[in-house]
Amino acid sequence: MVSIARKNLFEDIPRFVVAQAGIMFAASLVTIQVGIFHGFTRSTAQLIDNSSADIWVSAEEMVYFELTQSMPLERLTEAQAVDGVQRAEAISLSGGRWRSPDGKIAPLRIIGFDPDGTMFRVGEVVAGGFNDLKEPFAFMTDRTNLDSLRLDGLGSTAEVNSAPARLAGLTQGTQSIVSSTMLFTSLENAKAYATSGLTSSVFCDVGAGDGLSCTTTYERRDESDESPPEITALTIADPITHLLIRAEPGQDLEVLKERLANALPDVIVLTQDEMATRTRNYWRLRTGIGFILGLGAAVGMIVGVVIVGQILYSSVSDHIREYGTLKAMGASDRMIYSVIIEQALWMAVLGYIPSLLLCVGLGAWTAATQGIMILITPLT
């Protein structure tokens, strides 16, 4: 029976090549559409996945990683004092305006973190290092952003808001599909970028129970003053966005989450997986782009199945007389079906292998040149 299936496939090579091209197209369509959807979903929480934090602490209004209220830096000290916390680190997120050397502007997402920290890591660093971010107005970005930012390479300078900016490092695979261009820098530099063009003042009060509460206010600076902002250390009133918590070895995370929620006012406490899931669900379920990409993946699968089914049906129909002859010679229905199934398996394998190679190559190219992840998995 195996020889009959092979003979049916290879007796007309031009027809076979056309059929396999159709199957390869259908398989590629499904793989790319589903891969884009999964890659989009993965990229939205990639920075969370790259971190080694056990727990994330954010303002209770937090919707997802980038959409949240700020907290004062004093929450960092309060978190470090909670029993079961081995280490706590802060990160800040703010928006900004990029002005390239030739005067072009673009939106930015400025992410500040502790270069000496151990939990927040931006991914693979391909040029420069985290220590370089300690220098005034130094930043890193994904290497796929160089063209859009109009930068030539390390040492290139531009302007963020009204502050100078110097490229000190490059990362790879860190740019989310749905985010503005991401700039990574130290907390101090991020503060300078976010407040450039502004003057600040701190007001503190002693509240009930003799607790000290401080707030920082900002006012627009005189535009005639073109001097760069001063890099200053953060104060307890300066805003941060998230706290990353590493638990003591053996510490139950659910118990520690409850302690942190009780010790820190107006916060939400999530594990790393919960934070990543919350962010992905927002983009997948609550935005138009998630719906459109999901719909595209579903339609791609349906179209792919229809194309493959039509090709297989056409192949069987072309050999209906041979199957009739086998039936007349006493072949059972099971034997006939085995020939058809064998033929379908050969067509699937011979169409899928080149399709997979094509999709892997395309995924590598888009990741390297555009920073767009097409996630190829065994299921796709």
Q: What spans do the regions from the language model cover?
A:
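Hydrophobic secondary-structure segments that place a key small or acidic residue at a functional site
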Residues: I91-S94, K104-D114, R121-S227
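Hydrophobic, regular-secondary-structure patches
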Residues: Q20, M24, S28-R109, G129-E135, ...
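Conserved transmembrane alpha-helices of multi-pass membrane proteins
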Residues: A364-T380
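Peri-transmembrane interface segments
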Residues: P249-D252, K257-V305, S315-H319, R334, ...
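Alpha-helical transmembrane segments of integral membrane proteins
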Residues: A19-L29, G290-Q310, A344-G351, S355
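A short beta-strand structural signal in non-transmembrane regions
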Residues: I55, L146, S201-E219, S227-A263
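Transmembrane alpha-helical interface segments in multi-pass membrane proteins
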Residues: G300, Y313, S317, R321-A367
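N-terminal Sec/SRP start-transfer signal
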Residues: M1-L29, T41, Q46, R280, ...
